[in-house]
Curated annotation (Swiss-Prot):
GTP binds at G300, D301, P302, G303, K304, G305, K306, T307. PANTHER family: F-BOX AND WD REPEAT DOMAIN CONTAINING 7 (PTHR19848:SF8), WD40 REPEAT PROTEIN (PTHR19848). Keywords: GTP-binding, Nucleotide-binding, Repeat, WD repeat. Responsible for vegetative incompatibility through specific interactions with different alleles of the unlinked gene, het-c. This is Vegetative incompatibility protein HET-E-1. One of its GO terms (molecular function) is GTP binding.
Length: 1356
């Protein structure tokens, strides 16, 4: 930033560029521009021409006015920005709002407002001129009005006419800007629409500035692109705001501002007299005013008013001048949303970004890679810490106050949170912390490590607290008096009793006054009632529990208290009614239920129909963990009263009643979605919600079972036996439960729960139940992705594609869709593949497990790396930054980093938690084929196409060794277990062993007949396994260099090898689409894992529907029995992939089209080729016989259709007109027309006699499968059944989306559709490369080589 400086003599000169943090107090000028040639530029100042210009008059005014206000520095936009420097101009416009905001004063010089003129009555006429002045119509002056803390207005005569405060009503009337905005409320309090509307009556010289002048209002930074136009500039601004808002919405777990309002309302409002004492407290003032104390710990016993004290401090800090950032969070142990360190950090970041939106860049950086999932999973704390630390180091960060209430109620990861607080409180950033908690030694111990701290003990400020409590007592009595109609004498006695017994505890006063306000307490009994309340919070709890025990509903109240204390989150009244055995007259009457809960009012409170404890101390008291456990007998007695048979019995009740209510309530399609493909994003919760009573139970029932199993009780044993309650639930309601979990957006939690159940059973009883649980876990895991997206697919896709021997499939067979008559070739058992992870946009070239097996990294041809959670199968991170395909990935041994090697010749080191790139290692001269971490994680080895191996220091990124000696690309590298050696495999057919200290090659292992694609050390380092494109694996002795085993059996290149952890087995992966497991000692293959195969590119039915023909990448055509799914013929002869196959009408011949450019005619019985038709200039994508079998139509990548005479093999017609590859062709039943589908997204109808195109249908996607129906009125396609209208060619050419009927294939080939609606999701292994249909029969050919046949009995 560059300022102007006025010296004592009145001379004005520009300063040098001032860095952030070194800028002195300054004033700033706001004005309207005159003619460009009369405004003073930066160049004019430098050249000495400024004084001669008219615009200098404004600069002189600002200098003199600032001098009068005690400031010699000031800023004027015309001459403090070098507009000839585009970089400086960009930075200036993006910083303008901040410069106005940080100015000590803003002077608005209005050349069209005069204070010398008078109206007819002799009064000054400037008010009328002020309201009509040009300044209010300019775009850039909007931020100049709003941003500064002080804005003063001056007339043409340089006379002060008022400031923003004194003129606010007039300014509001002119501009329509709310008074709150003019008074300094955060702009984030106003909607995007409202802020945009403030520009309505304004204009700018350059049209793009209508958007650019709003950058500061929304605190966004975007590049300036003059020439793009106003609409494009506004579109970019809106897009940026939209993406930022989406990120902020995903970050938000709660809005602490709303929590503050809720807390204050629940406690009867914030009373200033109850907290104002702290403003004059020495410790608080030292923290607030000084620089040497950046952390203030406010500590005190329960009920001492810590939370309301912090609410008051927050309100006072909001009034700070200049305004800073204020972020706060209220922990609450009973609410799982806000009782953990992650939630605290999300809340603090949320408020910081809400107030200073430019800080969103620190969140967007990792968020743009990972999306919403960044805020989930085991690494979220690390990610949030990095974001938070980055925000605190932002050079544009204003003075920031961070406040956390009730650290003792942060029940998860408190030590991590305390470490973060102490660490950041010691930095030089402009931040200060206030935290509050009970007097817990472990909190004190960790906060003691902070070097710049202060402590404010409420017990040591007893006199101040007592005064504040007395004010609180008076406030409560003032509220009580009108309700109870007590006279002054009685009020005085109540006040005296409260004063003498409160013991400095706000909560004690609140609970007693609440009890006295009960309408059931008679006026004449009030003093007697008062006398029953003893001193001290725990004593009061004990007395109130005793009173509950004497009520008519004592047992019911105790049950409610027990359940409320045992559940894992606050529960709704509906959920409570399902977990506690209620009398009939209560369970069916919401008002009666609420009345019963209010009987527990000393302990519980109802907010928005959810039951909470009035205070954490109340819950602690009931659980026997009150503040003084050593001597507090009352708390232990309370525990024995509420949990007479132990808390495990309450866990049992919650578990059993959860199972019972789920069994009663859960049913298929509980939200009446009806459509099988109804997506979760479109679901709206019905009113009333049929899941209202079971929401808690669905998610937590297994947690309570686990509590029971881990206790000393033996009640759980029968639950885990065959034919018990759990067994019955799973065999009758399991699918309904999965559907409900999906609707509740809690399916991952459900999968983890069923895994816990499997673990519980695995250590106890064996039988049918454990088998069902294991199968259920596999079922849920396999189809998690689709059930999560479309809940009703639990009954369609999941049941249809589950193996035939799956117990869940057998048990729920009655739930299978009735509209599917038969389906062929579904596997009998769950295969070895437990998960398929989808998300990459291209081939996956490398995968690696983390050391703990909980994550997988994958590198892809799409230039990205993805991190996956292996338990749930969800992608947690997407790492972007490489400029080419990612050929290799590796986790560091500590699981915190990922290394990747790419086509772009670099290795990148990534933080696995945040997804940020921490190092880019450059130096290779070719593609990086392989990367590996050393066992200690301090080094990375890389192998490249440049024939070298490089060893890198992982911390500094420097190359410490370059190992040369291979004669071709280095395709694989591996460290030995001790890190002292590296093995490398190369395209020169050798393996080399290298000493990492000296960089010398100690062994060259020769014997392979092809490139060595993979090498691996055994765990003891004494052997190396190698895989080659000679189709073998070799085991080598590293000491002697001899080959001890050659493992043969693969039918293709061996591209990956690895030893088992015990060194006894070797696994190998090959491009023959198999994985083999070998005995490393004997060399025998013990297992072959199959599941991949060559892609099927085309399928066709025989006319009688009894056979199916398929064409494959392997160049063959296979004939299949459609009933049994067995292959009856293999036809070989094409020189490339077979893209299309078709039966002749009599079923005796098959036509096939290939990428070799030919069509072949085959005898279906003998398998011999009878004709080869040549003439296309590209791949033959589709073939079809005419109804009489005498002609064949073919469609090609050369964009033409050809008609062939099958007898002579001659081409009789070439049809041209498509703008893309012709993917499908079909004859009409009368043979007079041909339909063709193309990648240009059209279907054309051709007259076969003349060769002319008679109709063009714009269908919006590629029709890869076509056939006419028998009436000639419809065309059956992969996207559905399309009606052919009898209209002119011109009108049909304009048809953009014909109506599709019956069954088809979705545009993304992942859904089977019915009448254009998604009905059946296809799992990844069935993703379709070829499709054909005959009536209601559909055949799919998949990329994995599978053929699957569906017969649909009716429409959905």
């Amino acid at each position: 930033m560059r300022l102007l400086e006025r010296d004592d003599a009145g001379e004005i000169r520009p300063t040098k560029d001032l860095p952030s943090g070194k800028i002195p107090p300054y004033a700033i000028l706001s004005h309207t521009w005159g003619p460009d040639e009369e405004e003073v530029s930066y160049k004019d100042l430098k050249d000495g021409r400024a004084v001669s210009k008219l615009g200098y008059n404004k600069i002189r005014f600002c200098a003199d006015q600032a001098w009068r206000d005690g400031r010699k520095f000031f800023w004027v936009d015309t001459c403090c920005i070098d507009k000839s420097n585009s970089t400086e101009l960009q930075e200036a416009i993006n910083s303008m709002f901040r410069w106005y905001r940080d100015a000590a004063k803003c002077y608005v010089y209005l050349t069209d407002v005069s204070t010398d003129k008078r109206d007819a009555d002799g009064d000054p006429s400037w008010k009328w001129a002020f309201q009509k002045c040009k300044w209010f119509t300019r775009g850039w002056t909007l931020q100049e009005l709003i941003a500064p803390t002080s804005v003063e207005f001056f007339s043409r005569e340089k006379a002060r006419i008022g400031d923003r405060n004194s003129l606010e009503r007039m300014i509001h009337d002119v501009t329509g800007i709310p008074l709150e905005a003019l008074r300094g409320s955060p702009l984030s309090d106003f909607s995007v629409h409202d802020r945009m509307a403030w520009m309505k009556q304004r204009n700018t010289t350059r049209e793009e500035d209508m958007a650019y002048s709003l950058f500061g209002i929304f605190d966004v930074h975007l590049p300036l692109i003059y020439g793009e136009g106003k609409e494009k500039a506004l579109e970019r601004l809106r897009e940026k705001i939209g993406k930022d808002d989406g990120c902020l919405a995903d970050l938000r777990v709660t809005d602490p501002r709303h929590d503050k309002k809720r807390i204050e309302a629940a406690k009867g409002g914030l009373l200033k007299d109850s907290y104002c004492w702290v403003l004059s407290n020495v410790q608080f003032q030292q923290w607030h005013d000084g620089d040497d104390q950046r952390l203030l710990w406010i500590n005190g016993d329960p009920g001492k008013g810590k939370t309301m004290l912090l609410c008051g401090i927050i309100d006072e800090l909001k009034k700070s001048t200049p305004p800073g950032l204020l972020s706060f969070f209220f922990c609450q142990a009973t609410d799982s949303r806000i009782n953990n360190a992650t939630a605290v950090l999300r809340g603090l970041i949320y408020l910081l970004v809400s107030q200073q939106p430019a800080l969103i860049s620190h969140v967007r950086r990792p968020y743009d890679h990972a999306g919403k999932k960044m805020f989930e999973g085991p690494n979220v704390w690390i990610v949030l810490c990095e974001i938070f630390t980055s925000i605190l180091q932002d050079p544009g960060l204003r003075m920031t106050y961070l406040i956390i209430d009730a650290l003792d109620e942060c029940v998860t990861d408190l030590p991590q949170l305390l470490e973060l607080i102490t660490r950041t409180s010691c930095t030089s950033s402009p931040i200060k912390w206030i935290v509050s908690s009970r007097n817990w030694p472990d909190i004190e111990e960790q906060l003691e490590t902070a070097t710049q701290k202060a402590r404010l003990s409420l017990e040591l400020n007893a006199e101040s607290i007592s005064t504040a409590v007395n004010a609180f007592i008076q406030n409560r009595i003032d509220q009580l008096a009108p309700k109870t109609k007590h006279d002054a004498n009685m009020i005085g006695k109540i006040r005296d009793y409260l004063h003498s017994h409160a013991n400095g505890t706000f909560l004690w006063v609140a609970l007693v006054c609440q009890a006295l306000a009960d309408p059931k307490v008679k006026k004449r009994h009030i003093l007697a009632k008062l006398q029953t309340f003893p001193r001290g919070l725990d004593s009061l709890y004990a007395r109130m529990l005793e009173q509950i025990g004497h009520s008519e509903d004592a047992e019911l109240c105790k049950q409610i208290l027990a359940v409320a204390a045992a559940v894992r989150r606050p529960i709704s009244l509906d959920e409570l009614a399902s977990l506690v055995e209620m009398p009939d007259d209560v369970s069916d009457d919401p008002e009666s239920l609420e009345e019963i809960v209010k009987l527990c009012g000393s302990f519980l409170i109802i907010r928005e129909r959810t039951v909470y404890f009035v205070h954490q101390s109340a819950k602690d008291f009931l659980l026997g963990t009150a503040s003084d456990k050593a001597s507090n007998k009352a708390s232990q007695e309370a525990f024995e009263l509420v949990f007479p048979t132990g808390i495990e019995d309450v866990s049992y009740i919650i578990f059993w009643r959860s199972l019972n209510v789920m069994s009663q309530k859960l049913r298929r399609d509980i939200y009446c979605l009806n459509a099988p493909g109804f997506l979760i994003d479109n679901v709206r919760v019905p009113d009333p919600d049929p899941l209202a009573t079971v929401r808690y139970s669905c998610i937590y029932w297994i947690d309570h079972l686990r509590d029971l199993v881990s206790s000393t009780s033996s009640k759980w044993v029968h639950l885990l036996q065959d034919d018990g309650d759990i067994h019955r639930f799973l065999t009758t309601k399991y699918l309904y439960w999965l559907e409900a979990l999906s609707l509740l957006r809690a399916l991952p939690e459900g999968i983890n729960a069923i895994r816990q159940l499997e673990s519980l059973l695995g250590h106890t009883i064996r039988g049918r139940l454990i088998a069902i649980v294991r199968d259920g876990y596999r079922f849920a895991l396999s189809y998690r992705m689709i059930i999560e997206k479309a809940p009703l697919q639990a009954y369609t896709s999941a049941l249809v594609f589950a193996p035939t021997d799956s117990m869940i499939k057998k048990i729920f067979k009655k739930e299978e869709p009735g509209w599917i008559s038969t389906i062929s070739v579904v596997e009998a058992e769950w295969n070895a593949c437990t998960q398929t992870l989808e998300g990459h946009g291209s081939s996956v070239l490398s995968v690696a497990f983390s050391a703990d097996g909980q994550r997988v990294a994958s590198g892809s041809d799409d230039k990205t790396i993805k991190i996956w959670d292996t338990a749930s199968g969800t992608g947690t991170q997407t790492l972007e930054g490489h400029g080419g395909s990612v050929w290799s990935v590796a986790f560091s041994p500590d699981r915190e980093r990922v290394a990747s090697g790419s086509d772009d010749k670099t290795i990148k080191i990534w933080d696995a938690a945040s997804g940020t790139c921490t190092q880019t290692l450059e130096g290779h001269g070719g593609r990086v084929q392989s990367v590996a971490f050393s066992p200690d994680g301090q080094r990375v080895a890389s192998g490249s196409d440049d024939h070298t191996i490089k060893i890198w220091d992982a911390a500094s990124g420097t190359c410490t060794q370059t190992l040369e000696g291979h004669g071709s690309s280095v395709l694989s590298v591996a460290f030995s277990p001790d890190g002292q050696r590296v093995a490398s495999g190369s395209g020169d057919k050798t393996i080399k062993i290298w000493d990492t200290a000296s960089g010398t090659c100690t062994q060259t292992l020769e014997g392979h007949g092809g490139s060595v694609w993979s090498v691996a050390f055994s765990p003891d380092g004494q052997r190396v396994a190698s895989g080659s494109d000679d189709k073998t694996i070799k085991i080598w002795d590293t000491a002697s260099g001899t080959c001890t085993q050659t493992l043969e059996g693969h039918g293709g290149w061996v591209q990956s090898v690895v030893f088992s952890p015990d060194g006894q087995r070797v696994a190998s992966g090959s491009d023959d689409h198999t994985i083999k497991i070998w005995d490393a000692v004997s060399g025998t293959c013990t297992q072959t894992l199959e599941g991949h195969g060559d892609s099927v590119w085309s399928v066709a039915f025989s006319p009688d529907g009894q056979r199916v023909a398929s064409g494959s990448i392997d160049g063959t055509i296979k004939i299949w029995d459609a009933a049994s799914g067995t292959c009856t013929q293999t036809l070989e002869g094409h020189g490339g992939w077979v893209h299309s196959v078709a039966f002749s009408p009599d079923g005796q011949r098959v036509a096939s089209g290939s990428i070799d450019g030919t069509i072949k005619i085959w005898d279906a019985a003998s398998g011999t080729c009878t004709q080869t038709l040549e003439g296309h200039g590209g791949w033959v994508q589709s073939v079809a016989f005419s109804p009489d079998g005498q002609r064949v139509a073919s469609g090609s990548s050369d964009k033409t259709i050809k008609i062939w005479d099958t007898a002579s093999g001659t081409c009789t017609q070439t049809l041209e007109g498509h703008g893309g590859w012709v993917q499908s062709v079909a004859f009409s039943p009368d043979g007079q027309r041909v339909a063709s589908g193309s990648s240009d997204n059209t279907i054309k109808i051709w007259d076969t006699a003349s060769g002319t195109c008679t109709q063009t249908l714009n269908v919006g996607s590629t029709a890869t499968c076509l056939s006419f129906d028998y009436t000639n009125a419809y065309i059956n396609t992969n996207i559905g059944r399309i009606q052919i209208a009898t209209a002119t060619m011109e009108s049909l050419n304009q048809l953009s989306s014909p109506v599709c009927y019956s069954y088809g294939l979705g545009q993304d080939h992942r859904w089977i559709t019915c009448n254009n609606q998604n009905v059946l999701w296809l799992p990844p292994e069935y993703h379709t490369s070829a499709f054909t249909m005959q009536g209601r029969k559909i055949v799919l050919g998949s990329y994995s080589g599978r053929i699957i046949i569906f017969l649909f009995s009716r429409d959905v």
